[in-house]
């Protein structure tokens, strides 16, 4: 699986937050993404991979250097739906990037 395929898979999970929820994480979609990430970490050789009750994913990669932590959140804004996302991939060739009715200009 290449990096584009991975990211397209990640955005398929409905991970928007639920501001009314008192649990952590606030939605089942966030737990599901965490579980998928844990499986990927195992598949690429990390050990002691686990997802705790709050959805945090941990793994260990043996090495000789100092420890390094990579931290990111898995939730997205509750302002828009996280369901039925239809990502668009564009091979960027420089210049202005058209985004529907708007543009992204370097």
Where are these regions (language model features)?
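Solvent-exposed, charged interface segments at domain starts and junctions
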Residues: 1-2, 106
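N-terminal capping segment at the start of a domain
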Residues: 2-28
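Sequence-level detector for tyrosine residue identity
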Residues: 10-13, 56-60, 92
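Structural signal for hydrophobic packing residues in well-ordered secondary-structure cores
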Residues: 11, 15-18, 41, 45, ...
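A non-catalytic alpha/beta surface segment that caps or lines the substrate-entry region
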Residues: 22-75, 85
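Active-site metal-coordination/substrate-binding segment of hydrolases
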Residues: 66-106
């Amino acid at each position: 699986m290449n990096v584009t395929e991975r990211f397209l898979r990640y955005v398929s999970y409905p991970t928007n937050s639920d501001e009314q929820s008192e649990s952590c994480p606030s939605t089942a979609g966030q737990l599901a993404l965490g579980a998928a990430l844990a499986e990927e970490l195992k598949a690429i050789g990390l050990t002691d991979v686990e997802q705790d009750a709050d959805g945090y994913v941990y793994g260990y990669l043996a090495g000789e250097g100092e420890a390094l932590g990579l931290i990111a959140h898995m939730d997205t804004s509750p302002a828009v739906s996280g369901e039925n996302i239809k990502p668009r991939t564009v091979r960027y060739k420089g210049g202005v990037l058209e985004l529907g009715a708007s543009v992204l200009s370097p």
